[in-house]
Amino acid sequence: VLLIRLKLGLPRIDEALEGGLRRGELTLFCGEPGSGKTALTLQLASKGCHEGLRVLYVYSDGLFPYPRLELLARKRGAPLDDLSSKFYVLHLKSLEGLINVVRRMELALLNYDLVIFDTFTAPYRSIKVENKRETVLHNKKLNQIAAILKKHAIDYGEWVVLTSRLRSPATNEEIFEDLVASNVLTYWSDNIVSVAKTDLPHQRKISLLKIHGQGSRVEVTTRVVDGFLEEVD
């Protein structure tokens, strides 16, 4: 596969990314639940399949939304055969499962061009953090996992994409997760894409906070159409 840049299919976002996500990069999509992170990753996965990439989608939020992916393929006029032959889903239920997937990637036992973890930090939400020492240990473990994924992306010229929720001022587990996303994932990510809800129910604001390792302030307004994101003219 000779493709060098992988587009999201949102013209102004892809332009700001200088043509798209580069091989060897770790990209973070972050936002509150329901903001549109999965919509973006599905769009990216569909685009990857259409470009001939082998896509692994590691999903941890219940049943994988196959109908949405098939709908997107039909909208783009892409053959569904591409999905069946190039697209593979792994369901995650625990932190041990996440560690196992990353270990298999490290040992080159999983051979894909694009690997998406959605939601990457979900396995950590099941962990009960009872003291500061446990928080430090879990942060250290996640730091190691993120470092392995970053090195893997570089060594094998792959695209690795993670999604993470933002902090909600509700519970300690969300505070812990926000700490993880801010201090660990942000550090290792080459690109950071924030997806936020607005006052309008079907409108989303996409902010590029980091582009190819450099800070950014690019913002683009999008709208939700058939469960996916399109730029607003």
Where are the predicted features?
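Conserved P-loop
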Residues: 22-104
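Pre-Walker A adenine-sensing motif
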Residues: 8-20
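Phosphate-binding/switch region of NTP-binding enzymes
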Residues: 152-233
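Conserved catalytic network of the ASCE P-loop NTPase/AAA+ motor domain
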Residues: 19-21, 47-51, 79-82, 106-110, ...
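A conditional alpha-helix N-cap/helix-loop micro-motif detector
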Residues: 6-10, 38, 95-98, 139-142
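Charged, amphipathic alpha-helical linker segments immediately N-terminal to NTP-binding catalytic cores
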Residues: 1-3
